[in-house]
């Protein structure tokens, strides 16, 4: 997908001063909002051919540009950032960000390294990257992509320009969906944190009903139509990871709490909760617990899903009365 399909990306690009960009850039935003597309567009602008003075976008898009290093690993490790002898392969070598940026550009004015999933770098990897940020080689740029705010060291943030891509408003998201040929779903059918490209991905993979199904499972449990074991089994069977299930549960609590605070009636899959009783503070505290769990999960992902679900289902039943 081209950046022209995403007007909010075009707006961000139009605000950037490419003649005065810092050596470090952090692009932050939810999954599916266009962070990679923005990084690609910025990289193309920076990688002007020093002979023809035009962009080599095709080389960037195909990840075959000699002055472009696109690191797209699920987890960014130390040897991806700096040379580690024990990770060296005599035949293949070991490409890393710091060594790449230290070399003179081949065909472009600049060199650009893009680090996807930068939030997965541990402190040692980030400190190794600081070398290229504190003492950058001439005409070198590092673009880091993260899906969480404030997930890197303060020393990293202090040396970078941060570009936050916010979620779209419901009306803007629906308009974008229609313009892209999607008229049979509404943005309100998805959690508020779901982004445009994520909706398209869920539609393509037939996962667009996951949130509604999750709410139905929770509703059945709270209204005593399903016991704890059956509910846990049904939640685990959903084709989403534990973090997304936590996000869904937080979204559910946000929606019912907001309706109470604003005296608004709920509709759709939430309408049964118009007659429910709950303490606002209890719901707020439960959301705080879930947010804390989500934070801990990123540090220690080996969390027992069944135990987690059992605890929070019990808290839900104690907090929401029918």
Task: Please report, for each region that a protein language model flagged, where it lies by residue.
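Charged, glycine-rich active-site and insertion segments that engage polyanionic ligands
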Residues: 1-61, 138-140, 147-322
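Conserved alpha-helical scaffold flanking the Walker A/P-loop in AAA+ ATPase domains
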Residues: 12-18, 82-112, 120, 131
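Hydrophobic residues in beta-strands of the RecA-like P-loop NTPase core, especially within AAA+ ATPase
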Residues: 27, 115, 129-130, 146
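A short hydrophobic beta-strand->loop->alpha-helix junction that borders the nucleotide-binding pocket
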Residues: 28-29, 70-75
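Conserved beta-strand scaffold positions in the cores of enzyme catalytic domains, especially
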Residues: 68-70, 162
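Conserved catalytic/switch belt of AAA+ P-loop NTPases
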Residues: 102, 127-144
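Residues immediately C-terminal
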Residues: 120-121, 135, 151
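Conserved D-loop-proximal element of ABC-family nucleotide-binding domains
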Residues: 123-124, 154
């Amino acid at each position: 997908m081209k950046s022209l399909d995403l007007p909010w990306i075009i707006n961000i690009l139009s605000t950037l001063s490419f003649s005065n960009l810092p050596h470090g850039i952090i692009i932050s935003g939810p999954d599916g909002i266009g962070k990679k597309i923005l990084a690609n567009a910025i990289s193309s602008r920076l990688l002007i051919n020093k002979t023809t003075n035009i962009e080599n976008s095709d080389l960037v898009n195909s990840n075959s540009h000699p002055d472009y290093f696109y690191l797209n690993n699920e987890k960014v490790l130390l040897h991806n950032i700096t040379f580690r002898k024990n990770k060296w392969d005599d035949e293949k070598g070991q490409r890393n960000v710091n060594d790449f940026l230290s070399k003179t550009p081949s065909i472009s004015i600049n060199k650009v390294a893009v680090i996807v999933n930068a939030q997965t770098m541990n402190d040692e990897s980030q400190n190794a990257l600081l070398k290229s940020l504190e003492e950058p080689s001439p005409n070198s740029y590092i673009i880091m992509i993260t899906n969480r705010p404030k997930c890197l060291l303060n020393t990293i943030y202090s040396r970078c320009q941060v570009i936050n891509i916010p979620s779209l408003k419901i009306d803007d998201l629906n308009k974008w969906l229609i313009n892209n040929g999607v008229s049979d779903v509404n943005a309100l059918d998805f959690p508020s944190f779901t982004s445009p490209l994520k909706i398209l991905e869920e539609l393509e993979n037939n996962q667009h009903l996951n949130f509604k199904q999750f709410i139905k499972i929770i509703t059945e449990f709270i209204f005593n139509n399903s016991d704890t074991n059956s509910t846990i089994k049904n939640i685990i069977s959903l084709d989403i990871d534990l973090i997304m299930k936590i996000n869904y549960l937080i979204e559910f609590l946000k929606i019912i709490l907001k309706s109470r605070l604003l005296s608004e009636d709920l509709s759709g899959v939430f309408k049964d909760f118009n007659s429910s009783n709950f303490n606002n503070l209890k719901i707020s505290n439960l959301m705080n617990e879930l947010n804390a769990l989500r934070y801990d999960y990123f540090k220690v992902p080996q969390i027992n899903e069944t135990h987690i679900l059992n605890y929070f289902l019990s808290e839900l039943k104690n907090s929401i009365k029918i």
